[in-house]
Each structure stands twice: as C-alpha cells, then as structure tokens.
Swiss-Prot record:
Covalent S-S links between cysteines: none
CDD domains for the chain: Macro_OAADPr_deacetylase (cd02908)
SUPFAM superfamilies: Macro domain-like
Residues annotated as domain Macro: 1-171
Family: Belongs to the MacroD-type family.
Protein name: Macro domain-containing protein RSc0334
One GO MF term: deacetylase activity
C-alpha cells in the first residue's frame, strides 16, 4: 500500500553528515562501536555516545534502541542489530525487516519526522544487498506512514543503484 505523504528516497552520502531527526546505526549486539557505519557514527558522535550505549546493555538482533545524536547533526541515533547472513534459512529476512520496523516504531515514539537508514547487514554481516534493498523498501513503505522523509543512505554507487531500483519497483 503506497504511503502518500512520506517521501522515500535513496542517496549516496556519509550518514553522519545528514541533518535529520534521526539516523539509524547498523550496530553490533554490544552497541559499543565497531567497523563500517557503526564505527563512523561512533567517531563522529563523540565519546558521549559510547557511554550512552554502555547504559543500554546491548541490543538483540532485530530490535532497536535510541540515544541522543550528541555531536551529529541528527537529534537521535537509533541503533539496530541486523542479522548475520547464514544462507537465508535462519529467518534472516524477517529479522532484517524487524530492524526497519522496530526502528520506525522507536522513531514514532520520539516524534521523529525525518530519518536516514544505512544499508543494514550488507557489510561484514554478509546479507546480499540485492535481497536486502527490497526488504528495506517494502518494510519502510508498510510501516513509515507517520514520517515526512525517509532516506536510504548508501555508501557505494552499487548500493545506491539497488535502492533506486527497489524504490522504482515499489511505486
């Protein structure tokens, strides 16, 4: 079902530079920083983020937790833990959809109107990007009606092409 009032778009950018109400962090279960987008967000947000994440006591796969944005332009950081790809037979698709759904639910609770998502689980967690993009777009279209602007922030040109295709096919 289309969302008439929300803008969904993909762009290639550094998610830590986006001025929106919330950015989503593709975190690990400890929430203590790591590689990829998680490490970039922790470095850009400053040391207060690590302290705030310690107080959250981790996060389970598919769930989401929230902290202030600290030194980022975004007001909030929503941390979600994507599934590790194990061949697709261990509910990876459902867990990935849960990351988007639970991040959006948390955004709604905090009156977030604009949000940016990275490509969750497609880096070191190995989720095939060509499968992840349609799951992300479909889930956000189904559960993002309360927002004004939803951005899929892609690191690579290849990811951007996948998200643009998924967005066009969903229209």
């Amino acid at each position: 079902m289309p969302i008439p009032t929300v803008t969904l778009r993909a762009l290639r950018a550094d998610i830590t530079t986006l001025a929106c109400d919330a950015i989503v962090n593709a975190a690990n279960s400890a929430l203590l920083g790591g590689g990829g987008v998680d490490g970039a967000i922790h470095r850009a947000a400053g040391p207060e983020l690590l302290e705030a994440c310690r107080a959250l006591h981790g996060c389970r796969t598919g769930q989401a937790k929230i902290t202030p944005g600290f030194l980022l332009p975004a007001r909030y950081i929503i941390h979600t833990v994507g599934p590790i790809w194990r061949g697709g037979r261990q509910d990876e698709a459902a867990l990935l959809a849960a990351c988007y759904r639970n991040s959006l639910a948390l955004a709604k609770q905090h009156d977030v109107r604009t949000i940016a998502f990275p490509c969750i689980s497609t880096g070191v967690y190995g989720f095939p990007p060509q499968l992840a993009a349609p799951i992300a777009v479909r889930t956000v279209r189904e559960h993002g009606a309360d927002l004004d602007d939803i951005v899929f922030c892609c690191f690579s040109a290849a990811d951007l092409a996948l998200y643009e295709t998924a967005l066009n096919e969903a229209r």
